[in-house]
Amino acid sequence: MGFIKQYKTDFDIVDNQIVLSEQYFLRNKALFKKITGTRFGKVLGLSEYESSFKTWANMVKIYEDEFDETLAKAGNIIEPKIRDYVNLKTGFNFHSYDPKKVQFDLFKDDSVFGGIPDGEPLDENGELAYQNDLPMLEIKTTSCDSLIYKKINGNLKMILDENGMPIVKKKDGKKDSWFDSNGKIIISTLYYCQIGLYLYLRNVNKGLFAIAFLKPEDYVLPEQFNASNREIRLIPIKIDHKGFSVLVDKARIWYENYILTGKSPKLTESDIQWLKENGIE
């Protein structure tokens, strides 16, 4: 998709930052997006792939990501199968939500933070079971192999061969990056922040990562994915609410400084290059 609003009309570059036009800001500010778990680490500058500026552009709706159809389809089909697998293995009853039915947000009382966790534990009455000391679920799918991607309009897209299969760059290369030298899985700070925000908003502290390592064919034929035939690691985590509140406060200040004003974070050199790639300079 790329930029969907008009440069020099809806927004402009002023003093090394993008400023929304007064007309666009007043007309659209009520529709600006909240900070979700996915965006949380990005606005804090923790993502190596997306700057806080790009996240800002998405949140004020002048830019839309161009999603990789192969990855999106695989995720939509495979993640429910992983959730079922986790329920079977743990005996928990993790529930997922229809995004449209909850209007893409379970935290409507918070004006800054929102989103939907991958799974929440329910009791036998269908009520949230956090009082039973059960964790929240976060699902991550990752390729075993390092695959070849190409940057198109500032977004990475998986490259397929003539048979429609992902092209392997290095066998087990992606999987190896998840482990330290002692063979222990390392959860990135970005992913920790993602589930951490939802735990914080629910006022609970236990989470459970389900990390599934996919093979190339899983991206092409996700309907045939069988969780029992893939390596899926379950990693429990905890957050410290007092420590995590420092990050929440930083993100809230970021929201107030940039979303509520219609003025972006200052542009970095990589942001300027990204704008040029999208025809804005």
Curated annotation (Swiss-Prot):
One Pfam family cited in the UniProt record for this chain: YqaJ
InterPro entries xref list: PDDEXK-like_dom_sf, Restrct_endonuc-II-like, YqaJ_viral_recombinase
Domain of life: Bacteria
Name of protein: Uncharacterized protein MG373
